[in-house]
Curated annotation (Swiss-Prot):
Binds 1 NAD(+) per subunit. One of its GO terms (cellular component) is cytoplasm. It is an enzyme of class 4 (lyase). GO terms for biological process: L-histidine catabolic process to glutamate and formamide; L-histidine catabolic process to glutamate and formate. NAD(+) binds at residues 58-59, 136, 182-184, 202, 207, 245-246, 266-270, 276-277, 325, 495. Gene3D superfamilies: Urocanase like domains, Urocanase superfamily. Its main location: cytoplasm. It is found in: Cytoplasm. This is Urocanate hydratase. Pfam families: Urocanase (PF01175), Urocanase_C (PF17392), Urocanase_N (PF17391).
Amino acid sequence: MTQRQGQDPRLDTSRTIRAPHGTQLRAKSWLTEAPLRMLMNNLDPDVAEHPHSLVVYGGIGRAARNWECFDKIVEVLERLDDDQTLLVQSGKPVGVFPTHKNAPRVLIANSNLVPHWANWEHFNELDKEGLMMYGQMTAGSWIYIGSQGIVQGTYETFVSVAKKHFNGDAKGRWILTGGLGGMGGAQPLAGTMAGFSMIAVECDESRIDYRLRTGYVDKKATSLDEALAMIKESDTPISVGLLGNAADIFPQLVERNITPDVVTDQTSAHDPLNGYLPQGWSMSHAAEMRLQDEADVVKTAKKSMAVQVKAMLELQKRGAATLDYGNNIRQMALEEGIENAFDFPGFVPAYIRPLFCEGIGPFRWAALSGDPEDIYKTDQKVKELIPDNPHLHNWLDMARERIQFQGLPARICWVGLKDRERLGQAFNEMVKNGELKAPVVIGRDHLDSGSVASPNRETEGMMDGSDAVSDWPLLNALLNTAGGATWVSLHHGGGVGMGFSQHSGMVICCDGSDDASERIARVLHNDPATGVMRHADAGYDIAKQCAAEQKLDLPMLNEELKKLK
């Protein structure tokens, strides 16, 4: 440890972590080198929001509990054999146990609390005592790839918004949103890709500057008038990062009778203590108050969220297509007395659920070689294997042209049950025959069709009322473990905060071996199949049709599925 005594063990400004590149291994095999590199990649300064504090994204979403735990995880992964499994409890390596070569090399449980105690107050006490860590979704599960990880999902959402509200034509229209953090930072690029202009309000100027540097936002403004002028004067879609507080800017538009075409928000409202700046407060004052009076920070932040949501509701009344983008801001406003906070829909039931019914979601992969050419070759392979999807091809072309890699080169690509296994096998074969310089890892966001229970986001408004049933992500994690994913994670509270979600993740390493091919066949079929199963069980016809076509064995539905074939 390099911290002085008395310092926060999660802070070390002397460290710069980057994943190794190339084919030389620090671990005993690629199956343990893969999680080692992806853990380090999560903390690359080009990837993480606050790497010196182990914070990857999403408020306080961390990769390890503290630096001592990080060092010990690295040490264990370097010595771990291919018949052993490391257990990680909220960012702390707690055990190594004998398993077998087809078992996961790492099993991770982050931020899980018994339901009665599953709230921010109890979590924060445990966090202060060094007993827990908030893993968000891909922070503590070591498969964050920077803002690209959410770009395509956001792009797909905005394209759906254009189709639903504007006959598919976003020309001359603009989006108002808040938040340019690790997730929200994807919005400006996704918006312009979909043909919209955007004003994204952000209170932390360094985040706007970072998005400018990495090509995710086009311009910076320091006043609403300046931002509006930039949009008005541009002949092409343009994104503007506006320095300010969303709780101030959104009501200003109401007062000035200016109605955006689309309104949403991706501030870190899920965490009122650490993720949302109260009205009238500076960043430094908020930092001081978090040390002095947490309850006051939370209360004041939630009051400010209520102001913002009230403005969003008014803009919706005036004709703006308004949607919640999964940060639980409606819930926070409801708790502050905005009784109609849920009058605008969440993005999943409004725009994404039909994709989930076919197991389509945020499939992603990263090149452990560190060579961008490996990603470009896999891009081409995706086009070869899925030749009849021009929308997907267009996405891949735009991604190559407009998205800068952060850390290890990676790609996000929304594909479903019928394609994930085929792509995984193709990538594994490319490693085997030397077409790729090193193995790739395939993972996904926890925001996927079968891996999350989140009543205010992914499972909002389920047809059968099963929004809060969290058996499904538990079954997903168990099945991915049985199938032999390289590492599997089970988290609580990602996206929407403590008490509001449970979710699971998996990553599988394509090392070119025959064993990997067998594991890929199981994992990359079963993982999206659980999403089809979950939605078919809830009564969705699209999911039932997909289950029938893919010959899933769903005991309670098999007689019905036979009639659909």
